[in-house]
Amino acid sequence: MPSTTLQQSFTANSLRLAPLTGADARALLGWRYNPPYDWYNPPPLSKEVVANLIDPKWQFHSIKADDALIAYASFGNDGRVTGGDYTAPAIDIGLGLAPALTGRGLGSIVLQAILEFAEMTFPSPTARLTVARFNQRAIRLYERAGFKACQEFTHERVAYWVMVKSLGEREHHSLTAQPA
């Protein structure tokens, strides 16, 4: 359960992004979501999975508030789902919020930090997310942040939306970023 200090950190938007460490990878592999979001549960802990998560080519980053791991983001091909059309130039973003923090209105602040980091770190003028259509909670968050659906496709009987947003179309908050 997040502490009062952690809640105040969210209010102050003082989130820190840094390349994912082995310890952070092992911690997030223990995250378990309640149905219907259990579909997002990470794979079981293994040396191979940890090695993939900390491999710089996948650009996984921890997101921390008061040194507590609250979320993660990936930048690049990991944010793509087989079957989508990703030919237009954009930075693909994958993300996850700690299960204990979901559904509490904190996603917008985390997403804002991710978008600011992406704008500072990657040359693309466009951010792109791929989201399962059943995840209406995430879709509402992305739409409120200015993302627009540009494509729908199905992979392994799951419908997805690809959503895009021009970077630079938001107000900036305080953010400490530690690029890879």
Role assignments for model-derived ranges:
Residues G103-F117, R140-R144:
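Conserved acetyl-CoA-binding loop-helix of GNAT-fold acetyltransferases
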Residues M120-T130:
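Conserved GNAT acetyl-CoA-binding A-motif
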Residues E143-E152:
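Conserved acetyl-CoA-binding loop of GNAT-fold acetyltransferases
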Residues R128-I139, H155-A159:
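Conserved beta-strand-loop-alpha-helix junction that forms the acyl-donor binding cleft
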Residues P2-F10, T154, V158-A180:
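Terminal substrate-recognition subdomain of acyl/acetyltransferases
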